[in-house]
UniProtKB/Swiss-Prot annotation:
Subunit-structure text: Homodimer.
Family: Belongs to the BetVI family.
Organism ancestry: Eukaryota, Viridiplantae, Streptophyta, Embryophyta, Tracheophyta
BP GO terms, sorted: abscisic acid-activated signaling pathway; defense response
Keyword entries, A-Z: Allergen, Pathogenesis-related protein, Plant defense
Cross-referenced CDD domains: Bet_v1-like
Protein name: Major allergen Dau c 1
GO function terms (MF aspect): abscisic acid binding; protein phosphatase inhibitor activity; signaling receptor activity
Organism field: Daucus carota (Wild carrot)
Amino acid sequence: MGAQSHSLEITSSVSAEKIFSGIVLDVDTVIPKAAPGAYKSVEVKGDGGAGTVRIITLPEGSPITSMTVRTDAVNKEALTYDSTVIDGDILLGFIESIETHLVVVPTADGGSITKTTAIFHTKGDAVVPEENIKFADAQNTALFKAIEAYLIAN
């Protein structure tokens, strides 16, 4: 099994605690309000903490239709969240799993930087194409910005 790592940082004017709540702790209630068309459905099995599984179905017309995400760890004090995509067509047939490590860091101006590292565990020596990574970055950034706008407005 191969491993390929990719990092993404997004700066926000919203405080670290509020962003962490919006993208991690309250994500199941925030996304339907902030980005109503982002998900067709989300089935949550668990209480949101470690071991929780979310079965996510994406809307018609999306190049990806499903993903199952397991929460591995949530630390509310350190503002960290670890999860793993364990199933769904998002794995593209050549990825075993996608491990994600997220940390939200406060900035001196009262805003925050969200740092995400994704580790793609691939089958054999497969490599995730750069265009797939760029597409994922664009989708994740758009969803983040929708949540950020919602948090600013509310």
